[in-house]
Amino acid sequence: MNILFDGNFAFHKTFSVFSTYYKGQDLGEVLRDPEKKQVFIRKLVIELCHTVRSFDDVEKVVVVFDTHSWRYNFYPDYKYALTRIRDDYYKEFIRVLDDFEAFLRNKGVIVSRVEGAEGDDLMYIWSVYFGVVCNEELLIVTGDSDIRQIMTSNVALFNNNSKNLKLYCTPESASVWRYRVPEGAELVAVRPFDVLLYKVLLGDKSDNIPSVKRGFGEKALEKFIATLPADPAVMPTVETQMFPMADWIATRFSDFARVPYEEALEKINFNLKMTWLGLSVYNDLDYVNANHQSLLEAMLTDVERQKNTYKYNKEWTLESFYGMPIK
């Protein structure tokens, strides 16, 4: 089995705890202090090692990191509330993030960061590589439940965001992944398409993505999903193109929610582009990076370049990975 970490989630999760040790202090100054910075990085390593040790037979570990998203080019108000106000320590925060990335690369872990790609985009591409190309099991470690939309029979998600640890998988693969569930965690089977519908129809306040219909909430969504076919064979798949997917959802949603089809289609098409992690989205982009590559080309190039570069072969402990004894 391989493990794929959401690097930005791990970094923010650890920092949220680390920062509580310095309440009332200038966090920029704290992060500039070499000794305190190393304490923070050691805590990141401890979290990483503990997670890997929770699973057996881990072959490769990949960590993905965000860059400035292509979605801002398409939707300038993307994540408006999150990006318009920066904390005073933001520059130091990013410097330490860069240092952590360099540290992981130096240790032989595969680190993936591609211009224009968010971690979500890279998690999808790496899931295709491990799950489809290699036909190997992949466990994605993130607190972002939206990523469950990319689960397959051999790609699952481990949410370590709280004391209530959960390993998510598709319903048809639960009998396999139940043997991978670490002690103290719960196995939860979820249909990936239902996760996508949640994002597309209800939007995402944290990303400033609107819902398709005002007042249409989670309970209404559950009722809508109950009207859909239960047989996966007649449902859209990851191979479905953008318009057929939008049309499939809009046709059924407009009837159920009594929304004009054209109105529903326009909003659903927009939300699909913003939230769906699928090849049809990337194939439809006009984004080009500094090397004149499309986003999809750039991500595939990164996977091809790094897929055989994994070198770490020691124990997943602070002493072995960080290179210094625990005091």
Model-assigned labels for residue ranges:
Residues 84-288:
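Extended two-metal-dependent nuclease catalytic cores across DNA- and RNA-processing enzymes
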Residues 40, 263-268, 273-327:
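Low-complexity, acidic/Ser/Thr- and charged residue-rich accessory regions of DNA metabolism proteins
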Residues 1-105:
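Domain-level signal for Mg2+-assisted phosphodiester chemistry and nucleotide/NA-binding surfaces
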Residues 19-23, 27, 77-79, 154, ...:
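Generic preference for flexible, low-structure residues
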Residues 23-24, 33, 135, 243, ...:
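Short, flexible coil/linker elements and helix-boundary hinge sites characteristic
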